[in-house]
C-alpha cells in the first residue's frame, strides 16, 4: 500500500520486524498499518521518517497507492 515507504525500508536493508522493534511498535500493528487496515498516526509517521533518516517528505513517504 505504501510503495515509497516499502522501497525505502528495502533499500536500507531493514526488516519490518526489526524496524517495528526499534521504533517500539508491535510487529503485527506495523503490518496492519502498512497494509492499510489501520492508519499511521502523525507521531508514528514522523518517528518512522526519522528512523529511516529520510529527506523525503512525510506526504511522499506515506502516499497511498
Give the ranges of each region predicted by the language model.
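Short alpha-helical "recognition helix" segments of helix-turn-helix
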Residues: 18-20
Amino acid at each position: 500500500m505504501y510503495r515509497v515507504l516499502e522501497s525505502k525500508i528495502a533499500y536500507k536493508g531493514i526488516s519490518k520486524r526489526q524496524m517495528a522493534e526499534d521504533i517500539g511498535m508491535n510487529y503485527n500493528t506495523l503490518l496492519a498499518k502498512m497494509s492499510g487496515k489501520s492508519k499511521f498516526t502523525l507521531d508514528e509517521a514522523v518517528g518512522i521518517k526519522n528512523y529511516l533518516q529520510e529527506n523525503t517528505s512525510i506526504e511522499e513517504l506515506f502516499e497511498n497507492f
